[in-house]
Amino acid sequence: MDKIAIISDVHANITALNAVLDDIYSRGISRIFCLGDSVTKCCNPDLVIDKLRENCEVVLRGNCDESISSPNAKLKSFWSRVKIGEERANYLHNLPVMAEFYMSGRLVRLFHASPFSTSHIYNPMYSNQNTLREVIELGSPMQLFENTEFLGKTPNDPIPDVIGYGHIHTPNVFRYKNKTIFNTGSVGMPIEMANDNNLQNADNRFSTLASYIILEGIYDSKELSTFSINLVRVPFDIEKEIEYLENSDMPGKDKIIKSLRTASSN
C-alpha cells in the first residue's frame, strides 16, 4: 500500500512544519503534497518555502500565496514579500491551483479552497448552525466536485470521487452522496476553536495541534481496492514559534501569538 501525506496552511510556521515533517518521515512516508498558503501569519516564510520545495512532490497555490506575490500586497503580506525576495515570490506566483491522481480506483482531486478560486469558503462545521453562510459562500458540497475553468477543466472531464482541500483550518473527513470530502486542517495556524461552535469554551489542548491527512491505497491505480483517509494531529513547540514572532518586527504579531495559544481566529 502507498501512503501520501497531505498538508496545508503552514503559514510561515517553521516550528510546526518541522514537527509535522518529522512525524511524516517517522511513518515511512516519502510522498508529500501541500495544498497552499505556505506564507503570512507567522514570521519565517523564507524558511518554510525552502523547506516545502525540498520535501514536497507537489505544492499548490493558496490565497495567501497570491496576496504575497502581488505587487499591491497589504502591509503584513508586504513584510513577508520583502523577507522572501523576488525569486520565492515568483515561485509562489507560478504554483498550480490543482493536483489530481487515481488511488485505489478513486479519482482524487486536491486544491486550496474550492474549484472556483483560492479564497472561497466551504466549511461543513457550519452546515447545521449557519446554512445561510454555506449557501452564500459556496452552496451544496457537490459544488466542490465541479469541473471549472479555474481548474483548467471542461464539463466532459471525469468527476472526482474524493476532494481534498485546506483554507478553513478545520480538519474533517465526511461522506456526501457517495463522495468523500476531507479537509487537512492547518499545519501552522490551527483555529478550530473559532470554526466549530461545539468547541466554544472547550479544552483547547487538542485544537492547538498541527494537523494533516494521510491517504493510503494504491497510487496511480484505477482498479478498485482498499483505500483509507486518516487525520493526524501533531504537537509542536508553540512557545518556540512565539519566540520567533516576539523577536521579529512583523506587523500584527500580537494577534498571531494569541491565535497560536488559543486556536482562535486572529
Locations of regions flagged by a protein language model:
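Core catalytic region of metal-dependent phosphoesterases/phosphodiesterases
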Residues: 2-93
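Active-site environment of divalent metal-dependent phosphoester hydrolases
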Residues: 11-15, 40-43, 64-70, 116-118, ...
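His/acidic metal-ligating clusters that form di-metal
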Residues: 27-28, 87-174
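Beta-strand-turn-beta hairpins that frame and shape the catalytic cleft
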Residues: 1-5, 100-109, 176-180, 223-227
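Acidic, His/Gly-rich catalytic cores of divalent-metal-dependent hydrolytic chemistry
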Residues: 174-266
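Structural motif
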Residues: 58, 108, 161-162, 179-181
